[in-house]
C-alpha cells in the first residue's frame, strides 16, 4: 500500500495522461463531448501541467513533452482575443511553475518573441474587481514582478484590495461574488479564490510577501473550513 501522497501523485499522473491527448497542436483544448470550449482552458491546462512538474520534476509524461505542451498552451492563451484575466492568470502561474524568472525557465525559452511580447502586454494590463476575479489580478501581479516586467512589487496592495472587498461586502467575512445584488452570491468561487492566491504566493519571487500576507488571508479561509462537516 502506497502512502497517501504517492496515491495522490499516481492519481494526478493518471488524470493528466488521459487529458493531454486533448491538447491540440496550436495549444487549444478539445472539449469533452457535450461541452463547449472555454477561452481560458489553455491557461488552465498550462497550470495543471506546471503543478504536476513542480510536484514530480518529470518533464515527460508518456509520449508528451511537458515543456512543449505548456509552451503551446501559453501561446494559445496569450493570443485569445476576448478579455480573459482568468486564462492569463492561470497561464502565467503555469509558466512560473517551471522557474521563478525568465532566465531560468525552460518553457519561457520555447516561447517565440511575439508570444513573449503578447504575454507581457496581457500581464501589464491592470484591473480591479469586486468578485473572485480579484484573485486573478493577484496572480498577474505576481507574474509581473517575478518575470521582471516591473521593479516595484504591487502584489501586497492588490491582496489588500481583495481583503477590503471581503470586509466591505460581507458581514460574515466570506467572499461575496455579487456585492451589488440584493442578497449576494456566496459559492465555491470564494474558496477557490483563497486556493488560487495561496498558489500564486508560493510561486512569487518575493518570498517574504507570503509570510506577511498569509496570516490575514488564513483568518478568512478558515471560515470556510469550519463549514465542512466532521
Question: Positions of the model-derived regions?
Answer:
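Low-complexity, Ser/Thr/Pro/Gly-enriched N-terminal "stalk/linker" regions
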Residues: 1-44, 48-51
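Aromatic-lined, polymer-binding surfaces characteristic
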Residues: 34-56, 63-221, 227-230
